[in-house]
Amino acid sequence: MVREKVKVSTSTRTRQWKCVESRTDSKRLYYGRFILSPLMKGQADTIGIAMRRALLGELEGTCITRAKSEKIPHEYSTIVGIQESVHEILMNLKEIVLRGNLYGTRNAFICAKGPGYVTAQDIILPPSVEIVDNTQHVASLTEPIDLCIGLQIERNRGYGIKTPKNFHDGSYPIDAVFMPVRNANHSIHCYGNDNEKQEILFLEIWTNGSLTPKEALHEASRNLIDLFIPFLHTEEENLHLENNQHDVTLPFFPFHDRLVKLTKKKKEIALKYIFIDQSELPPRIYNCLKKSNIHTLLDLLNNSREDLMKIEHFRIEDVKQILGILEKK
């Protein structure tokens, strides 16, 4: 466990955040406590409420969402040679904590032979996913039988609730909890005199191990920034001069000319054969582009600056980073 003394900055200009306590209670329970100061009266509550909602509702997680086996007649049946009922096995699979960056649906498998215990380490996963706690229990095989279960893995946010219509062909949906943050609280400490009251915001974050509290804090902050960016662009896109009927649109980026020149420069190269996963892009940017059906550098350069900024969770800094990578090609 790491704990630091809280030092209050006397400056009213520079806000600083700091991790003042960090500990790992188990493989599936991380804790972190952070401070942000100095803040004016009322600002701590504004930030604290927004951060808590973003931490609990905006972050994505990876979960097992479906299990399939042709030998299972229904969810509440039992199988000879397995101590747990099918329902109990599904509940155990629901508790498996996964860490990974993936887009869409991926398949995984459990293939085990009894007698013995089946744990999370027996799950065969795609390369982009890993298990946080390999010791998590799945089933107990009491006889020399083969247990083969097909699994479906997805990345999403919030809750995934199963519905009766999703039961078919020996396939059983699993109620998924995609939230990597188990809990988040904020508290406020006031200091200073009545004329110059200031606040310190304390944030406490508990995660399931798929993210550290610090990673969760960074991701929630980025998501909040992305949510507010459209409000900044609206004025820039629709600026009207008082004595002129023509719209004047401010450029999105000062470096748009670089994008135009780069497109011309690369015209002779077979960009359609260079895929974006060869360009050393960070996972978040890569996933944003894939979701928008941008698979090659040619796809990317055929998008205008406006098109790129319409991509969900995409930021101006991401375009700068992409340009830097492309100019090296």
Curated annotation (Swiss-Prot):
EC number: 2.7.7.6
Name of a matching Pfam family: RNA_pol_A_bac
GO cellular component entries: chloroplast; DNA-directed RNA polymerase complex; mitochondrion
UniProt xrefs under SUPFAM superfamilies: C-terminal domain of RNA polymerase alpha subunit, Insert subdomain of RNA polymerase alpha subunit, RBP11-like subunits of RNA polymerase
GO MF entries: DNA binding; DNA-directed RNA polymerase activity; protein dimerization activity
GO annotation, biological process: DNA-templated transcription
UniProt keyword terms in alphabetical order: Chloroplast, DNA-directed RNA polymerase, Nucleotidyltransferase, Plastid, Transcription, Transferase
Subcellular location: Plastid, Chloroplast
HAMAP family for the chain: RNApol_bact_RpoA
Function (record text): DNA-dependent RNA polymerase catalyzes the transcription of DNA into RNA using the four ribonucleoside triphosphates as substrates.
Name of the protein in its database record: DNA-directed RNA polymerase subunit alpha
Species whose genome carries this gene: Gossypium hirsutum (Upland cotton)
Organism ancestry: Eukaryota, Viridiplantae, Streptophyta, Embryophyta, Tracheophyta
